[in-house]
A protein has these predicted regions:
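A generic, well-ordered mixed alpha/beta core segment in the N-terminal half of proteins
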Residues: 26-82
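A basic, amphipathic helix-loop patch mediating RNA/tRNA/ribosome contacts
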Residues: 4-34
Length: 188
């Protein structure tokens, strides 16, 4: 923060970075810090990373996500619109518009299905899985979103097509293939 103030006073622009919630729930702050997605520590995002994780005098290397599908916009800001396009490719639910609608809240969902869908919905789309994968694969993100959308009764008729469309869009966006290394799961 002090460095940004000094740059502004000199008439220079501070380094651009993305942020939104500052609570670790939006994923906008995603950075590669000292060779790790979100920096040292597990289960946190960059905005939750405290300077006490580093020693006095440490040189800290901060980089944007490194993936073809996340082009750098400026400095540390990347375009993660590819995730939005993947979700849009499969994130739809057919609706009966004949007038004989069943209230969506009236459809019972079992507790195990609800819990599993909720677990899949915890993906905030930060991209740490892609950034940590040597192949820049988005398969963990896609599988989380496919699971989230397919476990609920709404949208079951198109579940298979949704999954195929999302994987196809992932390929179109330039993400790499999964080779089951598991780095994505470690960073998520």
């Amino acid at each position: 923060v002090c460095s940004s103030d000094l740059l502004v006073r000199k008439g220079d622009e501070p380094i651009a970075f993305d942020h939104d919630c500052r609570e670790g729930i939006c994923g906008m702050c995603s950075l590669f810090i000292d060779g790790e997605a979100h920096g040292p520590g597990r289960g946190i995002t960059t905005c939750q990373l405290h300077m006490r994780k580093f020693k006095d005098g440490d040189t800290i290397h901060v980089e944007p996500w490194r993936a073809q599908a996340f082009p750098v916009i400026k400095d540390l800001v990347v375009d993660r619109g590819s995730f939005d396009r993947i979700q849009a490719a499969g994130g739809f639910v057919s609706v009966n518009t004949s007038g004989n609608l069943v209230d969506g809240n009236a459809l019972p969902i079992s507790k195990p299905d609800s819990d599993t869908a909720f677990d899949a919905a915890t993906c905030i789309g930060c991209g740490a899985c892609v950034a940590s994968c040597p192949n820049s694969s988005a398969m963990l993100f896609v599988s989380a979103k496919v699971s989230q959308l397919s476990l609920l009764p709404q949208g079951r008729p198109e579940a298979k097509m949704r999954a195929l469309n999302m994987v196809e869009q992932m390929d179109k966006e330039g993400f790499g293939s999964c080779s089951a290394i598991g780095a994505c799961e470690v960073e998520c």
